[in-house]
C-alpha cells in the first residue's frame, strides 16, 4: 500500500476545499438568479409568483398544460407552458403582456370564443398571481 506524504494530503485537501467553495458559489449564483427572476415577475405583474404556483395547481391548469418541475402539470391538451415568459404571443394572437395574460386567464372565451381553454372563473388576484408564476418560466 502506498503511503501518501503530508504534502500530497495537503494538496488533496486543498483541492477538495476549492471544489466545495466553487460548488457553494455556483449554488449561490443560481439561487440569486432565481430570486431575481421571481422578484422581476412579481414587479412586472403586481402578483405573487409563489401563491400563483399554488393557484396554478388549485385550478388544475396542469391537467391540460405541461410545465416542467410542477407537480400534476403533465397535461397534453393545451400548449406546454415552459418558456411562456419569453414568448412574443399568447393565446395565439395576443402580445405577451401581463395585462393580456391576466385577461386570457380570467376570460379565455371572451378573448377567443370557442377556444379549448375553459373559463375557470379565475378571480383578478388569482389571475395576477398565476401570471406572476408563469412569468418565472423563461425556459
Regions found by a protein language model. Give the residues of each.
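Hydrophobic membrane-insertion alpha-helices, especially the h-region
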Residues: 12-28
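Electrostatic cytochrome c docking/interface patches
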Residues: 32-57
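Short, Lys/Arg-rich N-terminal segment immediately upstream of the first membrane anchor
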Residues: 1-9
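Short cysteine clusters
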Residues: 61-64
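Flexible gly/pro/ser-rich segments immediately N-terminal to CXXCH heme-c attachment motifs
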Residues: 55-58, 119-121
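Cys/His-rich metal-chelating microdomains
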Residues: 67-70
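Extracytoplasmic electron-transfer domains, predominantly the class I c-type cytochrome c fold
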Residues: 72-139
